Amino acid sequence: MVEAAPRNFTINFGPQHPAAHGVLRLVLELDGEVVRRVDPHIGLLHRGTEKLIEHKTYLQALPYFDRLDYVAPMNQEHAFCLATEKLLNITIPKRGQLIRVLYCEIGRLLSHLLNVTTQAMDVGALTPPLWGFEEREKLMVFYERASGARMHANYFRVGGVHQDLPSKLLDDIWDFCDPFLKVCDDLEGLLTENRIFKQRNVGIAEVKLADAWGWGFSGVMVRGSGAAWDLRKAQPYECYSELDFDIPIGKHGDCYDRYLVRMEEMRQSVRIMKQCLEKLRLPEGQGPVATRDHKIVPPSRAEMKRSMEAMIEHFKLYTEGHRVPAGEVYVAVEAPKGEFGVYLVSDGTNQPYKCKIRAPSFAHLSAMDFLTRGHMLADVSAIIGSLDIVFGEIDR
């Protein structure tokens, strides 16, 4: 009797796996405990966002961006607003820019807190998520006090932001900053020199810089491999060029370096937030939070009570929407997960002709086979945790 040739064992990872971070399904080919092939299956959260946007006005298209990376919603709104403003050829007032940057950095904290703590949970540490979610709750309240919503804020608007921030909110965000740095130190105390955490992350999924560029990585995935590439410094938008902050980079490009980069990025985000809060209190930080052009931004309720023209402009804006000059533009922002880009094509009507969304997580997940091949089965969850993927933007 001829002995059958040994063949690899195929298993499903997800889509209901707690370490899958959403509806991820991986088909893993195993040789014993060693992973020989990884086949990601996506599309379980596909909602046709890009097509839906083509049938909406520019204002109606905005809430779809909250639902992409739903961990840090305002960062995605930012890209769409900047793209539309570029086509309209408008600049927004200084106060509006500062508020946008402040809330983008709050979004970065929200995203990194979730990622770092759940990455720890994926390798067996249960305390960090409890501490991290306590801080996220405070940040969610800041979202709620600005926009009325904890998650899907719809706060950034074309031309600025929806409404000004109350001064008490600015004080409370300031009071949050320094104690939060202590929480970062506590989290590092739990994880950075933790023997088990290091054994599970050091040397796992090392990415050389050339490979990172080749796979289309961005954000922490390239900074962890040693490139100081951050769109806030490389291609500054809004008022980032006036702010002082550093770009942390890794040395080895492994899971552990990516964790360290995210921890330091949270500290830099707090630095940026404090600078924004200081500038918002200065005389040059006062003024409107959105452009005064009522063809783009609706007039205030007070104006509508006084002026028939304001009433008409408000009605036209919410029924018909504003018309955007024909053209095409690509705008990218440094979202917490990497370079989030919006390629927007306008045909001169009140609806986008095409809106292509460049999701950073999509490029990172596509390299899952490259990153995981040759590692152990137990390393798969550690690698997914260090990629920081979210399915809202991968499946769109």
From Swiss-Prot:
Compartments in which it is found: Cell inner membrane
Keywords: Cell inner membrane, Cell membrane, Membrane, NAD, Quinone, Translocase, Transport, Ubiquinone
UniProt xrefs under HAMAP family: NDH1_NuoD
GO molecular-function term, one example from the UniProt record: NADH:ubiquinone reductase (non-electrogenic) activity
Family as reported in the entry's similarity comment: Belongs to the complex I 49 kDa subunit family.
Record-given protein name: NADH-quinone oxidoreductase subunit D 1
Cellular component GO terms, alphabetical: plasma membrane
The organism of origin for this protein: Nitrobacter hamburgensis (strain DSM 10229 / NCIMB 13809 / X14)
Free-text function comment from the UniProt entry: NDH-1 shuttles electrons from NADH, via FMN and iron-sulfur (Fe-S) centers, to quinones in the respiratory chain. The immediate electron acceptor for the enzyme in this species is believed to be ubiquinone. Couples the redox reaction to proton translocation (for every two electrons transferred, four hydrogen ions are translocated across the cytoplasmic membrane), and thus conserves the redox energy in a proton gradient.
Catalytic activity, as annotated: a quinone + NADH + 5 H(+)(in) = a quinol + NAD(+) + 4 H(+)(out)
Quaternary structure annotation from Swiss-Prot or TrEMBL: NDH-1 is composed of 14 different subunits. Subunits NuoB, C, D, E, F, and G constitute the peripheral sector of the complex.
Pfam families, per the entry: Complex1_49kDa (PF00346)
Main localisation: membrane
Top-level taxon in the UniProt lineage: Bacteria
Enzyme Commission designation: 7.1.1.-
Broad enzyme group: translocase
Topology relative to the membrane: Peripheral membrane protein
